[in-house]
Amino acid sequence: MLTDLIIELQQTLGILHKQDIQLASRQGQQRLIGDGEAIRLGDDCAAIPDENGYLLLAAEGMAPSLITQDPWFAGWCSVLVNVSDIYAMGGRPIAVVDALWSKSSDQAQQIWAGMQAASARFNVPIVGGHTNTHSGYDALGVAILGRAKSLITSFDAQVGDRLILVSNFQGKPRPNAPYCWDAATMAETETLQKHWDLLPYLAENKLCDAGKDVSMGGIIGTALMLLETSKCGAILDLDAISCPAGLDFRQWLLSFPSYGFLLSVRPQFVKTVKACFQAEGLIAEAIATIQPGHNLTLKLGSESQLFWDLQQNPLTGFTGDS
């Protein structure tokens, strides 16, 4: 059973498409800004030091298939995924801008409606961008600015840390996008804000060594990216991962969960970190242990097999080098 699951996961596009990022990583692992400060590349956001902590800058593009099948939800997700990037690094969002190309005003309006709904729900204004409704195709990209007092990076997982998976089971698969678990469109702003605020709380109280939001690479793909940038390995116990009722386990492993994070936490802080999320009705489970090396090993029942060797087969190519 584990062998079949590994073969399926290794071939999923959500993971394989992350290798496209190697086009960027081959250009270097850091960039210098005006004052000579080095910005490490490969995190959820670029973290730019300023006098009050860090400015956070990120951008996301929407899959063309999602824009075609569910334009409102594509607009919604374009804001959601950017907001998630900011909170994943311990920050708070300030504003977003967008770049929208569409074949018609009607299509653009549906996308805009989703973006505006998410903007209102997450209290993050859309403050500018680019719009073209005479394009030969539909495309959407959104960028976000945020600020953090303290960071949760994906560069600093430590050997011996426990990897905690955080998720929200109060949702359902989106009808036109079954690998998108929708835990946000029906939730109240106040509830969502309480959930988001837990991440900067962890950062500011130094309760987390590293972290990353769960992306379209799913739980396993996100774990790989975190291990790669931290230059670590891990043993991940699939039996430790709970699944929402009525959802196939393999589907859950590959889903974008709306609200989902992998947090690398020192053993003495695991109980505290889990309690923070569980107090808000969220799921927080220790699913892996950070190991020396460069291998992600999956465990299921009494079976244990190598899933990925990041030294032999890089994923994004970003290794957190400064």
From Swiss-Prot:
GO terms for molecular function: thiamine-phosphate kinase activity. To M.jannaschii MJ0640 and MJ0799. NCBIfam families: AIR_rel_sll0787. One of its GO terms (biological process) is thiamine biosynthetic process. Disulfide bonds: none annotated. PANTHER family: THIAMINE-MONOPHOSPHATE KINASE. SUPFAM superfamilies: PurM C-terminal domain-like, PurM N-terminal domain-like. This is Uncharacterized protein sll0787.
